[in-house]
């Protein structure tokens, strides 16, 4: 192959990811060329003929070029009859075909890393009587690095559309006709002197074998022992640009394994992305059971590119955050069915990875699957943390636990806990325990009370029961204090502090905030439509 792009043309794209999926090598190559606005042609030479040629010359060269590349010098062909008496090949028929095609092209692609759509456009001159006919395309996400790149893509698509707008179709006996080789038309009443670029040539030839073979190979359209062709061409003024090829479509999701740095638990990017390797990838280190090959499946952090991981919630510095770890099997879906736009939408349990709260048929647990929640393990493989939700009818329970200092908080129906086993009853209520140190801080005050109110009525800091008990204790202390003073015994000096404590928590004195909270009154609704502390 020989590449002959114009040096002034934009540099060829460097793709982060290009996957050949259910397409031949040739289809894959030509699709990539078309996406970059590169056309191609074959140059045929007779083996061993020409300057510098030898018998090792294959005689066929694939030439890749863009719309700005300089084409070969045109070959002069006459518009004339084809006859055995003629010394030169000729073109015997030539007609022009016009078609109304788009004259404006717009391309736009969403760039998630920059959180913006990168767009570009291109337009072709057209007659005032023809309205603007726009074609708008949105290639895969992140396709364009900048607006100039998007405008270049729009130009490629516009040039490809213009090829359909002005074409010439002809026929003749010129054996030098080849796609991409310009020709100059002579002696034509309308197109004499025009230079055309053939886009496709169909060759038809018959041999001059004996009468028996000739009868078997008879063709009513062509004389035996002769040659004819027909072709489609475009004026040289129209840029030669390839038509965009359809990308292979992925029908449904696929599974893959997460890969990363050796001996690491997870190898993510800042933007919540990981690297994956599909089961069908062949290479040096394919997935277990995969086929070996020279490349394409390294099994580490060099595999492919970053793939985004979908989450339950995602926002600016808020949302859920659960990255699949190396070796995890993940479910991969593709935007618009494009193999080069994978997105991880979930993780899967399999024969090697069982759920942390396994239950059900053959689960070995003593419950039918009433446990749910989250269970994580340290990156070094030691220690676990979990949030368990037990939905057993009549025995609802929530548990927060970490193996570090065996620290836990349990609410509701308290039982002996196991990941696959519901143990015996230990009580009902709340339990906060740790094998290490513990402390409780409350900057505005802390109330610990054994008084229960039916139905949990009123507000969080309503402590009417505590205030009543403090008032009773205050009256008792005052009575004791008066009795002691009557007997000439020193009184209870702590009484004043008890009064201060009661006033601090009494909503009728100092135990209420009377301002607004988030624009709403801090007082609870009271009888008669008013509010009270």
Regions found by a protein language model. Name each.
Residues 1, 9-533:
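Amphipathic alpha-helical and helix-coil boundary elements used as assembly
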